């Protein structure tokens, strides 16, 4: 990943966090890493943990196409690790935030 892509990712996550806070979410953690993968944002709302993948672009391709079954499987393993590491067993869902040309699309409770 180049520097521009890295900085774009941070910018996208910043925008996503701002959006989520306006929607009443509490941001618990950003960029949670495990040997299985990474979760961009971990947030909480109404006692439910939300593990949020952020996809950001300023180009013309569809950002949601960058999340596939393999990436989702890595996210699920990372969520399991997060639960074990923190000694919790709460309800959760996986969400996707797509940001394209400053338009935010929030897809809740995604699956394949």
From Swiss-Prot:
GO molecular function terms noted in the UniProt entry: nucleic acid binding
Gene3D superfamilies in the cross-refs: 3.40.1350.10
Family named by the database record: Belongs to the UPF0102 family.
Protein's recorded name: UPF0102 protein Cj0148c
Provenance organism: Campylobacter jejuni subsp. jejuni serotype O:2 (strain ATCC 700819 / NCTC 11168)
């Amino acid at each position: 990943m180049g520097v521009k892509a890295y900085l774009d990712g941070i910018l996208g996550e910043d925008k996503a966090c701002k959006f989520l806070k306006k929607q009443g979410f509490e941001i618990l953690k950003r960029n949670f890493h495990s040997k299985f993968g990474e979760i961009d944002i971990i947030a909480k709302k109404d006692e439910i943990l939300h593990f949020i993948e952020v996809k950001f672009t300023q180009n013309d391709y569809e950002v949601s196409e960058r999340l596939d079954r393999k990436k989702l499987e890595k996210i699920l393993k990372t969520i399991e690790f997060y639960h074990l590491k923190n000694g919790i067993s709460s309800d959760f869902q996986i969400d996707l935030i797509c940001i394209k040309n400053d338009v935010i699309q929030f897809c809740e409770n995604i699956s394949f």
